[in-house]
């Protein structure tokens, strides 16, 4: 079967009409918009809890970006801080964060943590956010020692 025929079949296979009708009704009745509104409120709460937990880190050569949208934010750290080691320390405490330097291709001076909050329950952020903040504070202080 050619790629064109497979694609044509996938786009027009039987059974999709019922799903499309159900989805159209879901949207028309306002359920989709309601779901989106609830999700936005949930993620805003999580983002705010994470920002509150990380507040003690700010001002010590650290700042946050990515708070306007998305399901993660970036905690930018000084260029001479080992963000890979810091991410590993967080992992050792059961926290999942990513080293910003792992995402940099053209620059070798970017350091920080990419912190996702979309999958984490609010209670976990409230409990574990301060743990992450303490790890960051310790790394910032030891960098100067």
Can you name each region flagged by the protein language model?
Residues 28, 76-78, 118-120:
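Residue-level recognition of strand-loop junctions within catalytic nucleotide-signaling folds
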Residues 1-40:
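Conserved core segment of the aminotransferase class I/II
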